[in-house]
Amino acid sequence: MVMNTDYLDTLPEIKNRFKVDLQPEEKVVFTAKPWAFSTEKGDLLGADDARITMTNRNIIADNGNGIWVTDIAEDVVDMRKQESGKFLTKQVYILVTLNKEVTYGIGIQKLNGYQFHFHKKDMAVFEEIIRHMAY
């Protein structure tokens, strides 16, 4: 799947709530405080203090201890809503799949993507954005 990042350029700029550093021509199009974010396998990376910012170029995930910057055009191969579990164990999240393995921590831990566990309102907004991005 190819991500249509041109769509992000058409979105209005919103407030840079989490004061992320921006490059020239980069604008914030989405911000949220998820209830959690984790690796693609579910290993917790951040919880209540986590902050997610999407610009027209990058996804920036900050857990308060470290910042992951992912170039959407270069690094992301897929973004989609996923559901796992049933009833009380049901989880709904956005799965971001990367085109290469990334190491983190002290360099031994690896991930190939992220799970963003947004609150319902933020989930709907993010879903609408990624719906327009998939070719």
Q: What are the roles of these predicted feature ranges?
A:
Residues 1-52, 135:
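Anionic N-terminal interaction surfaces
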Residues 48, 55, 90-92:
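A generic structural signal for well-ordered coil/turn residues at beta-strand boundaries
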Residues 53-54, 62, 81:
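Generic beta-strand structural signal
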Residues 35, 59, 93-97:
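Short polybasic amphipathic segments
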Residues 3-4, 66-135:
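Acidic, Ser/Thr- and proline-rich intrinsically disordered linker/docking segments
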Residues 55-56, 73:
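Structural motif
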Residues 46, 58-69:
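Short aromatic-glycine motifs in intrinsically disordered, low-complexity regions
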Residues 34-36, 58, 65, 83:
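Short, well-ordered turn and helix-capping elements at secondary-structure junctions
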